[in-house]
Amino acid sequence: ESSADNNKPEGGKGEDEAAAAVVPVAVAGGEEKEDKEEFYSALEENKKFDRSFRAKLIQSSDVVKERYGEVYNMLMAYKGVKSRYSWDCETFKAGGKVVAKITVIGKTPVLFLALDPTEYIDTKYRAEDASKYSKYANTPFRFKINGERKVGYARELIGRTMQEFEFTGESKTLPDIPYMDDESLLAEGLIKRI
């Protein structure tokens, strides 16, 4: 029996047929099997890491990095604002209280603000209430920044959140966030093996 015969699935839809549907590249015999194994190995490898907020941001698209940078600059434009990273998010404090948090969920930056989400139910902001999660109890206003218009809305919402703080001027320079591969992130402690 030839090696090409070994690659044929036996009756029904086998794993190889499902892989062929995902990887539409036609390759000869043994190479096809190697490509499929490599594809599934890469998928499996990607699931074996717990990624920190910074790791997600570092490996995000330029659009996500730009939106994050704009929101970061908006928050840092107020006197006394300090930020720090935790595993899940970046927290912004001013006057001794938490005013905002930002994280990346999937491919979307998500902003949490110290505003009451119930006051914004039927508004253009489409706020979500995150108060049921203890880590967002102080910043229950959950707002997805999934478009340029939402960046403008974030500016308005941050202005409302920061009313009691002095505006000192917003930087137009976005933070530089160079891409790093998984190996580098692992070495830096920004991702953990599960």
Task: Please describe what each predicted stretch is.
Residues 6, 22-24, 119-123, 172:
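Disordered, low-complexity tails and leader-like regions
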Residues 72-76, 159:
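Generic solvent-exposed, charged/amphipathic alpha-helical segments
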Residues 76-85:
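A mid-sequence, solvent-exposed acidic-amphipathic segment
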Residues 99-108, 184-194:
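Short, charged low-complexity intrinsically disordered segments located at boundaries
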